[in-house]
């Protein structure tokens, strides 16, 4: 069965384009039996340079593109910015309803949130089965990738991870579908840990910020695994090894799963890619 995918991205950075390109390449070379039925971006053309480049990539691939600026929608509604940990303001619910209306002509089996910076309201999360890419292992730090990395450094963690979970109205708390973990200790990275420890985490963060070598290396290792995890996860759906029933991931027998550990497959792919 060819899996039909809806793709959602804010495209604030270049990673969104890399994720989509990786999926399209896997489709083209036959590794993934899927099609991207539609791409949605919550930035309008001309609003952001990175989003513009992403949208041009979508158009060049011949994929239907739908855009609706969440920023301009909020301004037109006179609404306040949604705050972490607080209920979504009414304008956000109205925005999601408009997104659902715009996407109604485009049916898809599963949605992928790849760098989509908005939390869906209950109605949208109930309407679609949505996979969210989160740059931490199950049970790991919540929040944006920057927050995750700083928390890993503060913890002095040995391992990091990437997971894909079902999106819910609660930030990064949906049922885990797949994940992988990887070492952030041992070998050359240990020297970067020693440098960060010598500075002190807070001092290093204040002085170097995201240019801290340890921060950059942890981020590099995570990004290397994001595209393979997205592709391998979509393969589990295309092969019907995993499905979503009643907002829970289940295996081919219908049993609820706690998340497939794809670490072995992802490490093999990373090693083969050099």
Place the predicted regions along the sequence by residue.
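One-carbon transfer enzymes
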Residues: 1-274
């Amino acid at each position: 069965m060819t899996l039909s995918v809806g793709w959602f991205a804010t495209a604030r950075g270049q990673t969104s384009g890399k994720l989509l390109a990786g999926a399209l390449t896997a489709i083209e070379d036959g590794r993934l039996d899927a099609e991207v039925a539609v791409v949605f971006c919550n930035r309008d053309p001309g609003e952001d340079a990175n989003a513009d480049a992403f949208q041009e990539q979508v158009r060049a691939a011949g994929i239907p593109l739908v855009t609706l600026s969440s920023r301009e929608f909020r301004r037109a509604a006179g609404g306040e910015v949604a705050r972490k940990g607080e209920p979504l303001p009414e304008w956000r619910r109205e925005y999601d309803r408009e997104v659902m209306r715009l996407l109604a002509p485009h049916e898809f089996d599963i949605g992928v949130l790849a760098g989509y910076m908005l939390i869906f309201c209950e109605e949208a999360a109930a309407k679609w089965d949505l996979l969210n890419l989160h740059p931490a292992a199950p049970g790991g730090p919540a929040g944006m990738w920057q927050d995750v990395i700083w928390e890993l450094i503060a913890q002095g963690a040995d391992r990091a991870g990437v997971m894909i979970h079902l999106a819910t109205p609660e930030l990064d708390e949906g049922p885990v579908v797949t994940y992988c973990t990887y070492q952030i200790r041992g070998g050359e990275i240990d020297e970067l840990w020693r440098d960060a420890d010598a500075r002190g985490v807070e001092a290093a963060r204040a002085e170097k910020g995201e240019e801290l070598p340890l921060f950059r290396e942890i981020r590099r290792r995570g990004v290397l695994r994001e595209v393979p995890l997205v592709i391998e996860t979509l393969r589990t759906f295309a092969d019907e090894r995993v499905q979503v029933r009643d907002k829970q991931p289940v295996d081919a027998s219908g049993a609820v799963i706690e998340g497939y550990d794809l670490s072995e497959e992802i490490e093999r792919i990373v090693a083969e890619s050099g």
